[in-house]
């Protein structure tokens, strides 16, 4: 479908456009005003965002490139409840102190990837705790709650699916929909925000906000959803068997981040290049047309470009150089370091513990299974003894050991 506005044509071509509450109306608004304020919300349930959030972050950047103003809404208030959308059970209630720490950490990550300044298109960071923490319950029920139909709320797939499974939905969680809807109203009144963007799982919450705006006689509000970032197997991006693919380099090294995208399924390369990088469409078409072993060159481009956006050009180039040197030139010295203390080596470190401590395996049980399945190597030699111990004898030939878990995960273990 061809649109009048360049922005909608762009996001449709790159695969961002999933649903819109009024696509013709939004198209005309973008065409007539040449300026719009839009927001994307992020929960503060963890100290870092992960790879699954990249599609939202890229959308923030694209809004700026087209001359629009993006608002990042951090859910310092709503995280105290937790979004029940398509969840099997209630999230654990986080202490307020943890939520505040997570909010600060997420802000630092976003500031590396999105341009925040006082210009017309400079992004803003807003925390919904600023207004939600001060709500008076009786006033909120009377002024806002009166506009919500419980029957309608129960009809949304995000809620209906959970109830159909006879899984409990607490009254606390049920209130989340009202609070997110109210966020849109606050952002419209304070910043003239007319557009909310979110993942496809947020459709019900977004529609609630738009309908509330109508009942409060606000200018027409719009909602736009993007597809969830799934891999070829239909699993959400951002999580692996050994943990989440964090955007914070203190939680996941740029080298491992690069490797994650280097190892995506062949079928995902073109789509991820469109959604997660700024590589031009014509170049993407050439890269995704590569076959057999040549597709690996496209994967390297994907990994490097995605790493540049998250960690900067220098870290991306270092990660690529280290990976190519280690795998193609067999130079283990360029692998990322994992440092262990002399005292640990003196007393001996269990290989099982080391696989777990490095983050290669999520548990000691998984580490044992890897070893027993001949999936662990030290200096390219298979080790299948779960009682194997790393000591000073392990370092007699060189100042480090190369530890491998499977074919694609490698690290250099160094004694401090």
From Swiss-Prot:
Keyword Protein biosynthesis: yes
Main location: cytoplasm
Any one GO molecular function term: RNA binding
Motif ('KMSKS' region): 236-240
Sequence motif 'HIGH' region, residues: 44-53
S4 RNA-binding domain mapped to chain residues: 349-414
Coiled-coil spans in chain: none
Catalytic reaction(s) noted: tRNA(Tyr) + L-tyrosine + ATP = L-tyrosyl-tRNA(Tyr) + AMP + diphosphate + H(+)
Self-association and partners: Homodimer.
Name the UniProt record assigns to this protein: Tyrosine--tRNA ligase
UniProt organism field: Wolbachia sp. subsp. Drosophila simulans (strain wRi)
Gene: tyrS
């Amino acid at each position: 479908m061809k649109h009048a506005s360049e922005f909608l044509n762009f996001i449709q071509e790159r695969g961002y456009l999933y649903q819109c509450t009024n696509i013709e109306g939004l198209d005309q608004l973008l065409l007539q005003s040449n300026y719009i304020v839009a927001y994307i919300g992020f929960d503060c349930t963890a100290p870092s965002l992960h790879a699954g959030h990249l599609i939202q972050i890229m959308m923030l950047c694209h809004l700026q490139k087209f001359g629009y103003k993006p608002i990042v809404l951090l859910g310092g208030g709503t995280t105290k409840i937790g979004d029940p959308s398509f969840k099997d059970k209630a999230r654990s209630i986080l202490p307020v102190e943890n939520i505040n720490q997570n909010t600060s950490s997420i802000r630092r990550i976003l500031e590396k990837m999105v341009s925040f300044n006082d210009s017309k298109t400079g992004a803003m960071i807003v925390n919904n705790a600023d207004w939600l923490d001060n709500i008076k319950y009786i006033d909120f029920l009377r002024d806002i709650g009166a506009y919500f139909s419980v029957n309608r709320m129960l009809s949304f797939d995000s809620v209906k699916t959970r109830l159909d499974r006879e899984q409990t939905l607490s009254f606390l969680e049920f209130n989340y929909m009202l609070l997110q809807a109210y966020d849109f109203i606050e952002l419209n009144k304070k910043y003239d925000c007319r557009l909310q963007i979110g993942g496809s799982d947020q459709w019900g919450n977004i529609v609630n906000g738009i309908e509330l705006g109508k009942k409060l006689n606000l200018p027409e509000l719009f909602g736009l959803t993007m597809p969830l970032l799934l891999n070829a197997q239909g699993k959400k991006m951002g999580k692996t068997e050994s943990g989440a693919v964090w955007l914070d380099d203190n939680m996941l090294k740029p080298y491992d981040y690069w490797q994650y995208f280097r190892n995506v399924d062949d079928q995902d390369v073109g789509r991820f290049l469109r959604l997660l990088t700024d590589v031009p469409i014509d170049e993407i078409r050439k890269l995704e047309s590569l076959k057999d072993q040549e597709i690996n060159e496209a994967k390297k481009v994907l990994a490097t470009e995605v790493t540049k956006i998250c960690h900067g050009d220098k870290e991306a180039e270092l990660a690529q150089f280290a990976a190519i040197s280690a795998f193609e030139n067999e130079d283990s010295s360029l692998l990322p370091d994992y440092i262990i203390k002399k005292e640990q080596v003196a007393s001996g470190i269990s290989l099982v513990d080391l696989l777990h401590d490095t983050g290669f395996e999520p548990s000691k049980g998984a580490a044992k299974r890897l070893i027993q399945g001949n999936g662990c190597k030290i200096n390219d030699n298979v080790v299948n003894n779960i009682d194997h111990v790393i000591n000073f004898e392990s370092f007699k030939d060189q100042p480090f050991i190369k530890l491998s878990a499977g074919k694609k995960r490698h690290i250099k273990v160094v004694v401090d």
